[in-house]
C-alpha cells in the first residue's frame, strides 16, 4: 500500500514537470507560428516571380540637317534616266545623237544640263523634272508651284527660264545661233499633272517624243552635227563626282 502511494506521487510530480515545460515553450511556438503566418500572407501579396519594371528612358534622337540640294540631285538623276530611255528606245540613233549630264562653262561659272539631243532638225535641250503632284505656272512667271495636297505646296524656279540659261551656255560653247535650239521641259513623274495652260514645249513624258518628232525640217548640216558632237564628247564636260561637287558648291555660294 505504501509503495502504491509513492508511485502515485511520482506520477503526479512527473505530470507537473511536463506541463511546466510545455507552458514555457508555448510562447515560442506561438511566436513562430505567427511569423510563419505573416510570411505566407506577404508571399500572397508579392509573388516570388514579380519583376519591378523601371520606367524606360527616352532615346536620344539625332536629327540630320535637311539637304534639299542632295534631294534635287537624286530626283534629277531619275528624271534624266527616264528621258534617256525614251530617246534611245524611240528615236533613230543615226539622226539623233544623245548627250546627258554635262557641266559646261557659263558667265564665269558653270551650268549643268540634263539632256541634249543633236540632230539635223536642231539641238534639243531638255530639262527633266521628276516632280509628283499638280503643277501650276505660267510662261512668264518667275516661280511655279507644285502642289501635293491642300497643305503641301512647294515653289520652284520657272524651268523655262532655267533652261533658257542652258541654251545660252550651249550657244557659246558650240557656236550655233539661237534659232537652231529647241528648249523642252519634261515632267517625268507618272503622278504629275499640268494644271494650267502651258506652251507645247512643257510636257509630260508621254508627250515628249511626239514633240521632238514634229520638227522635220533640216537646219543643221552634217559636218556641223559632227563638229558639235565632237565638242560635247570632250571629257572635260563630263559631270564627274568631283566636278559635280564643285558645281553644287558654286551654286550655294551664289547670291
Which residues make up each language-model segment?
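Active-site beta-strand-loop-beta-strand hairpin of nuclease catalytic cores
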Residues: 118-140
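Short acidic loop-to-beta-strand element that houses the catalytic metal-binding Asp/Glu
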Residues: 112-118
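Surface-exposed interaction regions that form or flank ligand-binding interfaces
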Residues: 1-111, 143, 151-255
